[in-house]
Amino acid sequence: MTNQRRTGLKNLYREEFLRSPAWFARRNRWFRDHTATGALPCAACGVVTVKDELELHHRDYEGVRITQGVWQAWEDDDDLVALHPHCHELLHRLIDRDVVLARHRTRRDASDHALRALQLKLHDVQAAS
């Protein structure tokens, strides 16, 4: 098991699923449900922003399926976390570079741990500013 990102042809998730109609429909549904009360904060830095400035991070891939060549997006709402693109990249770097998070934790546990660490680091940076 590995939580590290895969590159190139080995990653059907990034190359196909994230470009699929199923993912765009699921993403739109998540944002519709979560922006009913207004703008959203980035889960890492806490800055409130709009849908077009956020990406969704998968805490778990259980809802991502491919059946007879067709992608399906059955993620629970709590499997997805809204992040600025830069914060999303930092989160993946924390997971990729930590051997324990990358190889010895579930995807959900690794994501949650890395997100907490990122929140603390970004809070420290904001407090110092």
Identify the meaning behind each predicted range:
Residues 2-44, 66, 71-74:
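Short, charged surface segments at domain edges that flank catalytic/cofactor-binding sites
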Residues 7, 16, 38, 52, ...:
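Intrinsic-disorder/low-complexity peptide segments enriched for small residues
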Residues 22-25, 36-39, 43-44, 73, ...:
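A sequence-composition feature that detects small, non-aromatic residues
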Residues 35, 47, 89:
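Residue-level marker of positions within ordered structural domains that often coincide
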Residues 43-81, 95-102:
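Histidine-centered nuclease catalytic patch
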Residues 55-56, 86, 90:
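Alpha-helical architecture
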Residues 78-79, 89-90, 94-129:
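A detector for short metal-coordination/catalytic motifs
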